[in-house]
Amino acid sequence: MPERLPAAITVLKLAGCCLLASVVATALTFPFAGGLGLMSNRASEVVANGSAQLLEGQVPAVSTMVDAKGNTIAWLYSQRRFEVPSDKIANTMKLAIVSIEDKRFADHSGVDWKGTLTGLAGYASGDLDTRGGSTLEQQYVKNYQLLVTAQTDAEKRAAVETTPARKLREIRMALTLDKTFTKSEILTRYLNLVSFGNNAFGVQDAAQTYFGINASDLNWQQAALLAGMVQSTSTLNPYTNPDGALARRNVVLDTMIENLPGEAEALRAAKAEPLGVLPQPNELPRGCIAAGDRAFFCDYVQEYLSRAGISKEQVATGGYLIRTTLDPEVQAPVKAAIDKYASPNLAGISSVMSVIKPGKDAHKVLAMASNRKYGLDLEAGETMRPQPFSLVGDGAGSIFKIFTTAAALDMGMGINAQLDVPPRFQAKGLGSGGAKGCPKETWCVVNAGNYRGSMNVTDALATSPNTAFAKLISQVGVGRAVDMAIKLGLRSYANPGTARDYNPDSNESLADFVKRQNLGSFTLGPIELNALELSNVAATLASGGVWCPPNPIDQLIDRNGNEVAVTTETCDQVVPAGLANTLANAMSKDAVGSGTAAGSAGAAGWDLPMSGKTGTTEAHRSAGFVGFTNRYAAANYIYDDSSSPTDLCSGPLRHCGSGDLYGGNEPSRTWFAAMKPIANNFGEVQLPPTDPRYVDGAPGSRVPSVAGLDVDAARQRLKDAGFQVADQTNSVNSSAKYGEVVGTSPSGQTIPGSIVTIQISNGIPPAPPPPPLPEDGGPPPPVGSQVVEIPGLPPITIPLLAPPPPAPPP
């Protein structure tokens, strides 16, 4: 390569140019030369800042998002550009662009002085076109300012204005560019920067757009076409002006024949070839909207990166490789199950589900889907609302009993504790309303079916009597239950402004909203829900009480191949491992026996241990199911997403006048249908070991026996054990004589220090209990038999079973 021009000559030429430009600029624009010094200082600052950006900045490039198997999810970009190194650009392309745009590229030092001075002199004589003599360096400067630096329309106009001032800035930056980089580096930067029309920026994307090949494979005629288009991408578009594009291509080939005599024969042959472009531009889909059933996950990835300090704008320009945690082998059955029970064409009803892999170091999001299509056509049922990971719907219903239970275990109760299950529960100070006939300023709760008068925590979670958990939250305290929900994973509830749907004038968080009013109904899950966070609650319990943010990122690689740290919140041991593991066991009967999800589990052929909980809101406008094993955690949430929510019905899922959708219907069916195909994909499935501390309760959790004592003695014994004693006794059916102390409510184990009510006999013997259910949760034992005779067969004896009690809804 020829030596650079001597510095002295360069300076003299620049000085002469500057002198001419100063005279012209002063004569035409600044009649009072006193302001010239200030203008010059500001111009110097502009040049210095522009040069720094030019040398250190990066051009916008496409970021590619892929799943865990390397399949592309989406391309995210503001300019469709893929940077490639010099050795990935064909020499044909390098020779073509130099030949047509700057044949003295190898000889000058960034500026073609003859052409530049001619252009400036022409400006002085009235020719406002100062483009004469622009080198590749100068073109690079102008294109960089236009395509990268300029953010506003005014800045873009300034980047291409035909004035000596811009030309002088361009010259100074071009000289700096030439001093900093080699010619090969400048040429590579140029070819990676410029526009080639049809939204193709840089030679790699241009080669793909017009020919469907890589830049390294461009032949003579292809390279010549692209090089010719740089002059005017709109007028030389081969799809709208093929004749003009062909003529310009051949002009480029003619210059190459002149400048490259050794390749003349091949270049003449290239002139005889047709344009050879694809029938249509090979454009790249842009953004999450083109990601199909992975679009909501794609949106969540961007939201997660934004929380980590990497904005959507940075992603759209940064040229990142975003390796995500999405597992296509999990995503496919999840989407299929969702669509099976909630058609994508179902108006006004959404079904969302996410699957998370538990862990103590990370909670990786394996799948995320909705029955809704991600898009802008509202009439077609499309939406761009982040439904799977935002607060939506009317709530998850009885699933929230998990939080009340966890708070009680944290206070010292064990899962062997017997919970009272009265037919009706009423209390003041816990909100108001609820069941029919509720007194003023009183919260009233009834059950949806008939239940035994008491049951242990495991059975209560499986069969879901409302009154048991209404009474339990009155003992635990609303604040503790809310705090537990947030700790385990419902983190959105702590965000300011989340209560606006319930109090538009307030900036309160949902947590503060519920606590301020001390709403006992929180245990019945009546407030909107983030379904991804509910899945993460399950992941926290499956991870031995370790909460981690639901993480969609496996690895983030920058354009230089370096890994970028992505940090949002850190993992935290939010409840003791013993509590989480024991609660997982307490939730293990929901899918068996009389559990509210047993029918769905059986229909899916589910035969593995798991923990789960169904939930339904009182008005049947939303319902859900959360379930987990030691290998995966997931929640399905179905809700009315119309502007005027109404009751939902089951089988098939639809709007109706009087709702009958329960968590044990479509939500749990969706969960088991989705998880059954991949149930054994991640290793052995088993329940964790329990912790005696949370099975039998902490010291002070056992209620002493007071049967046979007088009332005063019973009160004293309970107080000595650390319990509070209710002022009023409770009259119960008993074979003991009238007025005798026969027990307490609760009895056995409960929360240490909680309120205990003394039970007094009313002298009326209790009714005999119904036949007990077998241990395996099967049908009740036979109460008789019947002989059936069928001709040709011996007599058949059929056992007669007592009708089982109806399975209560969650």
Regions flagged by a language model, labelled:
Residues 139-150, 192-199, 216, 220-232, ...:
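Glycine-rich, acidic and aromatic/proline-enriched surface loops and short helix-turn segments
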Residues 1-64:
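N-terminal type II signal-anchor transmembrane helix
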Residues 320, 324-346, 353-355, 368-370, ...:
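A penicillin-recognizing enzyme superfamily signal
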Residues 59-261, 373, 462-464, 473-477, ...:
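Peptidoglycan glycan-strand catalytic modules in the bacterial/periplasmic cell-wall system
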Residues 71-82, 205-209, 234-238, 312-318, ...:
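Short pre-catalytic segments that frame enzyme active sites
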